[in-house]
Design a protein with these regions (language model features):
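Outer-pore turret/helix-boundary of cation channels
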Residues: 18-33, 76-111
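Alpha-helical transmembrane segments and their helix-start/interface "positive-inside/aromatic belt" motifs
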Residues: 1-5, 62-75
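Cytosolic juxtamembrane amphipathic/interface segments immediately preceding
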Residues: 50-67, 124
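Non-transmembrane accessory domains of multi-pass membrane transporters/channels
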Residues: 164-237, 242-243
Length: 364
């Protein structure tokens, strides 16, 4: 084996290990090459999307599919190049066409390698020794295996995307399309009756945990950005965290003690936090707005508006929970403020109640 063939074999093994860790081991951040490749493509496409101005959002919605195609192409090129480096020294001797001269350049080697991997057609080149026949056999097995693995991986990615979108739309419908957790809570407790609230919230736990695990299994989901903000992970994550914070701090502690201490409330809080932390840990995010005076003022205005909404719906509240709400919200607000801009959303699109309050203040 020559040095060139050794390098080629190592390159094939490197890409196979990357495919194994990404597709079969399937945990966020475990790939060798794929995480770096997807981040580079994301950064380049996001920078390019800024050239579209107001159409930046729709342009970013194409990033997810483009990254999928680019990653498949990256893997195919890497395997083909590695196999070509192994094949090239054998061209003209143990690997040759049925008739005519045999070019020994790298392009010809890549064409033959692509044929042996079943990626492209490579003419009538054939192996003429036991070792090269075994090489072609191994290459064909690698190509067929990788193709089936990638296809099944794509099915799972898009299945996870569909489930995520379904969860996001469900939560948006429960807010009556407002994106306001106070409206969602008011509709869960019509006339102050919390009888069905626990079961309704419990119905969200299974799809939430499935969405969280889908992002951990299939990191490509991070890069799928829907132009409509209602489908944003940061949007429905914000709504759920705001909802459980309102339940913990604003509802009457005696009348709604069962709801406040219920498992669904605790599960939604923890599950949503885990989902956002997964995105924050494995996706390029930047600092939030924690501790800034204008952010704290906005939180206070937001909770006052939420209390008003709940009172108008006949829900018993206590007004002493404002400081507690602000304190608890500060614990998770910075997380959503990091994730949302990373996906090209503004906090106006995510925190709908605060946006409505600020718009009202400006008109006065």
């Amino acid at each position: 084996m020559t040095l060139e063939q050794g390098v080629g074999a190592a390159l094939v093994l490197l890409f196979l290990a990357d495919i194994f860790l990404t597709v079969l081991y399937a945990r966020a951040g475990t790939g060798l090459l794929a995480p770096l490749w997807t981040r580079v493509i994301w950064a380049a496409l996001r920078a390019g999307a800024s050239l579209f101005g107001r159409r930046r959002g729709p342009a970013l919605s194409f990033v997810g599919p483009v990254i999928v195609v680019s990653l498949i192409g990256f893997w195919a090129f890497g395997l083909t190049l590695g196999a070509a480096l192994v094949i090239r020294p054998e061209l003209g001797t143990t690997i040759r066409p049925a008739s005519g001269d045999t070019p020994t350049d790298l392009v010809t080697a890549m064409l033959v390698a692509g044929n042996s991997l079943s990626i492209v057609g490579g003419g009538d080149y054939a192996p003429h020794s036991t070792a090269t026949r075994l090489l072609f056999l191994v290459n064909s097995l690698i190509g067929a295996s990788v193709l089936s693995l990638v296809l099944s991986y794509l099915v799972q990615v898009y299945s996870g995307l569909r489930e995520r979108n379904a969860l996001a739309l469900t939560i948006d419908l429960m807010t009556d399309g407002t994106g306001d957790a106070a409206v969602m809570l008011a509709r869960l407790m019509p006339g102050g009756d919390s009888g069905n609230a626990t079961s309704e919230l419990g119905n969200l736990i299974a799809p939430l945990t499935a969405t969280k695990e889908a992002h951990h299994f299939y990191p490509l989901l991070f890069y799928f950005r829907i132009n409509d903000a209602r489908y944003a992970v940061s949007r429905f994550g914000f709504v759920l965290l705001d909802l459980v914070t309102l339940i913990d701090t604003v509802l009457d502690q005696d009348r709604y003690a069962t709801l406040i201490a219920s498992s669904p409330v605790a599960s939604l809080r923890r599950g949503t936090t885990l989902l956002l932390e997964t995105l924050d840990a494995h996706f390029p995010t930047r600092g939030g707005r924690e501790g800034r005076p204008e952010a704290i003022w906005a939180m206070r205005q937001s909770i006052v508006a939420a209390i008003r909404t709940l009172e108008e719906s006949g829900i018993a509240v206590h007004h002493d929970g404002v400081d507690d709400y602000v304190s608890r919200r500060q614990a998770w607000d910075a997380l959503t403020c990091r994730v949302a801009p990373a996906m090209g959303y503004t906090m106006i699109e995510i925190d709908r109640r605060s946006s409505a309050v600020q718009s009202l203040v400006k008109t006065i």
